[in-house]
From Swiss-Prot:
Membrane-topology annotation of the record: Multi-pass membrane protein
Tagged with keyword Cytoplasm: no
Organism: Bos taurus
Residue positions the entry lists as glycosylated: N170, N183, N188, N232
Protein name: Leukocyte antigen CD37
Assembly and oligomerization: Interacts with SCIMP. Interacts with SOCS3. Interacts with DECTIN1/CLEC7A.
Keywords from the UniProt entry: Cell membrane, Glycoprotein, Membrane, Transmembrane, Transmembrane helix
SUPFAM superfamilies recorded: Tetraspanin (SSF48652)
InterPro entries: Tetraspanin/Peripherin, Tetraspanin_animals, Tetraspanin_CS, Tetraspanin_EC2_sf
GO CC annotation terms, alphabetical: plasma membrane
Cytoplasmic side: 1-17, 75-85, 266-280
The UniProt record lists the keyword Membrane: yes
Length: 280
């Protein structure tokens, strides 16, 4: 075996092993998404967050797993069987993904003001329509989760929630905000969420879907977060910018590496005897 043949064999098996790893990873992601979709109660008990929009994330994970498995399968079969058509398709798909990521990065960098305004509009619409459609709670649950995790209330301030119809039980009642705005650390009652509403408890199987429980709200003059989420979200993005950029660069470098290996293998295969001819 010549040095050239040895190099081709090394590239072929490297590409195969790497894609086999990502195929297994995609399978795990897909199974994880299906598990969340089918058995929500067990997953809620596992993570301890009953108000997360699990259905959305389960579908995202399932689709991501399928796409990862499909792309990895192209790389595995194309490399192992030395099929130029599959290697070319694999390279083209990776190139498309890489170009999409670059385009999104440029758009986010140049359209930050417009994106921020769009996010603000979506959040304000979610607040205005809070609990008006009990069957459509994904956006509301997502925003509750943001407020709970980032310890904030409303977009600009808690006043965003004032005068929202679903927050008042009667006209004489004062302003109220969702339970996700409640600052439990400001009190000595560590079980406040269990007492306020099952949707914020960490009781797993005892948790109920939002549309089966009364709207959970607390008085605006109680212990609530006084800062809006706009600043907290900006701070979170700033604090995690290095991690986000690092992940994006890592994914981009992986894609470039796989593209390089696949195009090298594709171009250096025997031009006279294509392995695909065996199966014609």
């Amino acid at each position: 075996m010549s040095a050239h043949d040895g190099c081709l064999s090394l590239v072929k098996y490297l590409l195969f092993v790497f894609n086999l790893f990502f195929f297994v990873l995609g399978s795990l992601i897909f199974c994880f998404g299906i598990w969340i979709l089918i058995d929500k109660t067990s997953f809620v008990s596992f993570v301890g967050l009953s108000f997360m929009p699990l259905q959305i994330w389960s579908k995202v994970l399932a689709v991501s797993g399928i796409l990862t498995m499909g792309l990895a399968l192209l790389g595995c079969v194309g490399a192992l069987k030395e099929f130029r058509c599959l290697l070319g398709l694999y390279f083209g798909t990776l190139l498309l993904l890489f170009a999409t990521q670059i385009t999104l990065g440029i758009l986010i960098s140049t359209q930050r003001v417009q994106l921020k305004k769009k996010v603000k509009d979506v959040v304000q619409k979610t607040i205005q329509n809070y609990r008006t459609h009990p069957e459509e709670t994904a956006a509301e649950e997502s925003w509750d989760y943001v407020q709970f995790q980032l310890r904030c209330c409303g977009w600009e301030s808690p006043q965003d929630w004032f005068h929202i119809p679903s927050m008042r039980r009667n006209e004489s009642e004062g302003d109220r905000v969702p339970c996700s705005c409640y600052n439990s650390s400001a009190t000595n009652d560590s079980t406040i969420f269990d007492k306020i509403s099952p949707q914020f408890s960490r009781l797993g199987s005892l948790a109920q879907p939002r549309h089966n429980v009364e709207v959970c709200s607390v008085p605006a003059n109680s212990y609530i977060y006084q800062q809006g989420c706009e600043r907290n979200l900006s701070n979170w993005l700033t604090n995690n910018l290095i991690s986000i950029v690092g992940i994006c660069l890592g994914v981009g470098l992986l894609e470039l590496s796989f593209m390089t290996l696949s195009i090298f293998l594709c171009r250096n295969l025997d031009h006279v005897y294509d392995r695909l001819a065996r199966y014609r």
